[in-house]
């Protein structure tokens, strides 16, 4: 079984995809199948929206104050699901919604995605892993090369 949601310190993390346009050298996904209480964060297949809804409906959110889109893939690779799941959560719970991202959504989708992302989440954490393009490319290894920085 693969964990779609994992509870860590009053935050529920939603792992909605394993796809990512980067091959970061430092990520735990390179050495571990899971973190925290999760048993496995690698999907046998990318979860359908109905599977994510089912995981939400079956999860105990009683200690939660924030949900975070973050996992073993870049959440914006599954942008349609991210937006739909955010709406689904907002209709049911009063939680803040945060996106942890590599910031490459516009490159991934070949268009501006900021407006729809900002309507779906309350806050965004962008990984700025290195101070310059050369070291960023060496460590993050993005599919889009230097324009990723």
Predicted regions and their residues:
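Canonical Radical SAM [4Fe-4S] cluster-binding loop centered on the CxxxCxxC motif
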Residues: 4-48
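Short, basic/glycine-rich phosphate-binding loops at helix/coil junctions
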Residues: 31-37, 63-67, 132-135
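Soluble or luminal CAZymes and related metallo-dependent hydrolases
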Residues: 44-51, 81, 147-148
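Short Fe-S-cluster ligation motifs
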Residues: 47-72
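Conserved AdoMet/S-adenosylmethionine-binding subsite of the radical SAM
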Residues: 57, 72-149
